Regions:
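Auxiliary Fe-S-binding modules of radical SAM enzymes
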Residues: 102-103, 117-249
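Conserved Radical SAM active-site core
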Residues: 1-106, 116-144
Length: 249
């Protein structure tokens, strides 16, 4: 068995995202020849110099040319951009989305998610958390390009991670905007799917008077939604008490 973080075989087999930095021309030829798809690509930016900096790899910018070959070979692709404040957001994000649009329809979806930050960052690049205003700006950019993609190709193409809507205190898009949840494992549409599935199941519950006490642990971002669902359950199951705990990473 051969496992490697940037192994293209794990991309189409298991959905791993790869940067293409260690992919040879032979690898690209094999993908095209056997039509191994979809290939999931970590773009992060289409600015070659910035990509080298972000990935700490001098070949990262040159690797973007491999996407041209995959596109010419008709290979279905998905992409992701992990957004870092002051690095690849703003005008750089606009540039990246504009550049990626040329790969439609082979590039069927791209997710934009905020970089995950924890308190354990000693010796790492100094990154800041996004604010509510930042999130609104990111959503504004994404919604603009969504409309353009939908008008031209009939699908939304570029998708914002759920965190942006929560941070911006905006409603999650309706299910149709997610194009079949192509980026679900990247945290795109999870909250909408959960809300819809909960509503469907909840409508069929009759409730009872059995005494229960339940504890649920969840992340800070999902905490308000889980609390809302727990409250709804308690109203139907009057002797059930649900404790929801938001865990900060």
């Amino acid at each position: 068995l051969y496992f490697k973080d940037d192994d293209s075989r794990l991309s189409f087999l298991q959905g791993n995202y790869i940067t293409l930095t260690n992919m040879s021309d032979d690898d690209v030829d094999r993908i095209i020849r056997y039509h191994l798809e979809p290939i999931n690509i970590s773009f992060h930016t289409t600015n070659p110099e910035l990509r080298c900096k972000m990935l700490h790899n001098r070949f990262a910018g040159e690797a973007l040319k491999k996407i041209d070959r995959l596109y010419e070979g008709g290979i279905t692709m998905n992409g992701q951009i992990v957004l870092c404040k002051g690095v690849n957001d703003g005008e750089e994000l606009e540039r990246s989305i504009r550049d990626m649009m040329k790969y439609l329809p082979c590039l069927q979806s791209v997710s934009v998610v905020p970089v995950g930050l924890t308190k354990y960052r000693e010796g790492l690049y100094p990154l800041e958390s996004f604010t509510k205003e930042d999130a609104k700006e990111v959503l504004s950019i994404i919604h603009k390009w969504q409309k353009k993609a939908y008008d031209e190709y009939g699908y939304h193409f570029i998708h914002a991670g759920d965190e942006w809507y929560i941070l911006a205190e905006e409603e999650m898009p309706e299910e149709e905007r997610y194009d079949g949840y192509l980026q679900l494992e990247n945290g795109v549409g999870m909250m909408r799917l959960l809300q819809n599935e909960f509503a469907e199941e909840y409508a069929g519950l009759e409730g009872d008077d059995t005494e229960r006490e339940v504890s649920i642990a969840t992340g800070v971002l999902a905490y308000p939604l889980i609390c809302k669902m727990a409250s709804a359950i308690e109203k139907k199951y009057t002797k059930t008490k649900i404790h929801v705990y938001g865990i900060r990473n």
